[in-house]
């Protein structure tokens, strides 16, 4: 039995829509209002700079991961397989698209079982928080075991679901299910948003629930309400949420330093300088997605490799010019904020911090 054509068409349409950045970009991520401090007396060899990080028992080559995007159908599967091979070559982590459809079409499990291509890197499976409630802890855990992944990402995408006429509406029980799954699993659990961000208080609550890592996935990147609005020809509603959400840097600046080792940042990080700023603010890793998707579909695998080569070069230059030999040194107060961002941050803290 093949996957229902409408499911495959929706996935294909999502990719097509996301290829046009200007149509689906949500708000501002405020990265342009952060500057790294220049150090004119960096007294070491550029070759001494290390971008290496350790995560889930793997040594990775830079603090960047390819975030979960799509899965299912030939187009999505070919895309994932290519990216997993690229990620393994680069020695960076990668997440796969949601494996929700495997509960209806278990015969397609090999399309999601890509650890054979990711033997040197962490590979993340992905499922919606609502599906934990729907399918139950034991079935989710069994599927993760069969997929042989190093961690699972569970995504919070209420905005996208509410914009989708056939999307989920009942989110009751997701916090309890996340806590139970975190306790039950033998692999780390990562919770991520999908473009609207996670507040400092929600970060604290998720960590108390037993979550290993949190991907903020803040506003300023792909806005999935806009994606669904375009797909369903209902921008009258979707456009009302074009600037909804919390930029990841607001949360990074709003949480205690002690929590940042458990936090990833994503949401509109497109350049090596964006990545450098996110790391300087304390993020453990930076996630990239749409920028990789566009490079791949517009110009192929070589364009993705070129993108990451640029990331490496810019990140190393930023570290040298700020006097940082290592990522830990870059995280030591090597930035300053514009007056505009300070004002915006003050408003944010007034309403989001207790």
Curated annotation (Swiss-Prot):
Q: Among its keywords, does the record have Cytoplasm? A: yes
Gene Ontology terms: cellular component: cytoplasm
Q: Which cofactor does it need?
A: FMN; NADPH; Mg(2+)
Which Gene3D superfamilies did the record assign?
A: Aldolase class I (3.20.20.70)
State the compartments where it is located: Cytoplasm
Question: Which parts of the sequence bind Mg(2+)?
Answer: 161
What is the enzyme's class at the highest EC level? isomerase
Q: Which InterPro entries match?
A: Aldolase_TIM, FMN-dep_DH, IPdP_isomerase
**Top-level taxon of the source organism:** Bacteria
Q: What is its EC number?
A: 5.3.3.2
Q: Which UniProt keywords apply?
A: Cytoplasm, Flavoprotein, FMN, Isomerase, Isoprene biosynthesis, Magnesium, Metal-binding, NADP
What GO molecular-function term can you cite, just one?
magnesium ion binding
Sites binding substrate sit at 11-12, 98-100, 160
Q: How does it assemble?
A: Homooctamer. Dimer of tetramers.
What does this protein's UniProt record list under function? Involved in the biosynthesis of isoprenoids. Catalyzes the 1,3-allylic rearrangement of the homoallylic substrate isopentenyl (IPP) to its allylic isomer, dimethylallyl diphosphate (DMAPP).
Name used for this protein in its record: Isopentenyl-diphosphate delta-isomerase
Question: Which species does this protein come from?
Answer: Borrelia garinii subsp. bavariensis (strain ATCC BAA-2496 / DSM 23469 / PBi)
């Amino acid at each position: 039995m093949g996957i229902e054509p409408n499911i495959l068409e929706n996935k294909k349409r999502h990719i097509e829509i996301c290829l046009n950045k200007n149509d689906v970009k949500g708000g501002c991520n405020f990265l342009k209002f952060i500057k790294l401090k220049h150090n004119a007396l960096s007294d070491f060899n550029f070759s001494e700079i290390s971008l290496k990080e350790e995560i889930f028992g793997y040594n990775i080559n830079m603090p960047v991961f390819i975030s979960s995007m799509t899965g299912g159908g030939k187009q999505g599967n070919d895309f994932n397989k290519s990216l997993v091979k690229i990620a393994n070559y680069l020695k960076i982590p990668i997440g796969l698209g949601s494996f929700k459809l495997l509960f209806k079409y278990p015969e397609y499990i090999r399309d999601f079982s890509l650890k054979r291509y990711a033997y040197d890197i962490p590979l993340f499976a992905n499922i919606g928080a609502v599906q934990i409630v729907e399918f139950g802890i034991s079935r989710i855990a069994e599927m993760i075991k069969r997929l042989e992944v190093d961690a699972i990402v569970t995504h919070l995408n209420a905005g996208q679901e509410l914009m989708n006429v056939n999307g989920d509406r009942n989110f009751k029980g997701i916090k309890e299910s996340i806590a139970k799954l975190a306790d039950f699993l033998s692999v780390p659990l990562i919770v991520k948003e999908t473009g609207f961000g996670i507040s400092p208080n929600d970060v604290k609550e998720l960590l108390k629930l037993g979550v290993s890592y949190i991907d903020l996935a803040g506003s300023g990147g792909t806005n999935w309400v806009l994606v669904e609005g375009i797909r369903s020809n209902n921008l009258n509603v979707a456009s009302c949420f074009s600037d909804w959400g919390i930029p990841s840097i607001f949360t990074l600046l709003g949480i205690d330093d002690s929590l940042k080792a458990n936090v990833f940042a994503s949401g509109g990080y497109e350049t090596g300088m964006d990545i450098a700023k996110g790391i300087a603010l304390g993020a453990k890793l930076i996630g990239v997605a749409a920028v990789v998707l566009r490079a791949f579909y517009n110009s192929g695998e070589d364009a993705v490799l070129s993108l990451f080569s640029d990331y490496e070069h810019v990140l190393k230059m930023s570290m040298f010019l700020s006097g940082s030999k290592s990522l830990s040194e870059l995280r030591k107060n090597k930035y300053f904020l514009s007056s505009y961002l300070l004002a915006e941050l003050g408003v944010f803290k007034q309403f989001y911090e207790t």
